[in-house]
């Protein structure tokens, strides 16, 4: 079972739909409807942090849940707000983007790592955000796995743990390869099941 944390965003159920199409069993909970302890007691095979309208500090249990997932090596993927939230517990800073993006389709450049494995570079992805993880503050444990042409971080992964984030919206109809990106994340949860 995947635990999907809903950060009160209209895109949440697009994620639910895409993940369901890929065969994932989901338990969807609002970010303020359970504690970190309750979330981890569900023993999720993976955790997805949805987009949302706020900054990571106001996203309910997201920040401490990332810490708990990291300590337990539970695969975790963040989308938009969820991606930004991944940067903070490891020491990164979330700042205002140079230009707010609301429904802009942009080209994503990458090296085929993390959840962007086996995708062409560049590909088209939809951006809805006014905040970004600041590259200058990115801690050594996180690596940039995708970026815009002007170098803004659009995807990151933990170097040792199964933790991944994408700033763009793979669940948007305008984004290319959304199902494949989510499938790549699901494969990290399945590999851990097989190893257990």
Swiss-Prot record:
Part of a heterotetrameric complex that catalyzes the two-step biosynthesis of anthranilate, an intermediate in the biosynthesis of L-tryptophan. In the first step, the glutamine-binding beta subunit (TrpG) of anthranilate synthase (AS) provides the glutamine amidotransferase activity which generates ammonia as a substrate that, along with chorismate, is used in the second step, catalyzed by the large alpha subunit of AS (TrpE) to produce anthranilate. In the absence of TrpG, TrpE can synthesize anthranilate directly from chorismate and high concentrations of ammonia. Signal peptide: none annotated. SUPFAM superfamilies: Class I glutamine amidotransferase-like. The keyword Magnesium does not apply. InterPro entries: Anth_synth/Amidotransfase, Class_I_gatase-like, GATASE, TrpG/PapA_dom. The active site is at residues 80, 169, 171. Gene3D superfamilies: 3.40.50.880. PANTHER family: MULTIFUNCTIONAL TRYPTOPHAN BIOSYNTHESIS PROTEIN (PTHR43418:SF4), MULTIFUNCTIONAL TRYPTOPHAN BIOSYNTHESIS PROTEIN-RELATED (PTHR43418). GO terms for biological process: L-tryptophan biosynthetic process. Heterotetramer consisting of two non-identical subunits: a beta subunit (TrpG) and a large alpha subunit (TrpE). GO terms for molecular function: anthranilate synthase activity. L-glutamine binds at residues 52-54, 84, 130-131. The lineage of its organism: Bacteria, Pseudomonadati, Pseudomonadota, Alphaproteobacteria, Rhodospirillales. CDD domains: GATase1_Anthranilate_Synthase. Pathway: Amino-acid biosynthesis; L-tryptophan biosynthesis; L-tryptophan from chorismate: step 1/5. Residues 1-195 form the Glutamine amidotransferase type-1 domain. The gene is trpG. GO terms for cellular component: cytosol. It comes from Azospirillum brasilense. It catalyses: chorismate + L-glutamine = anthranilate + pyruvate + L-glutamate + H(+). This is Anthranilate synthase component 2. Pfam families: GATase.
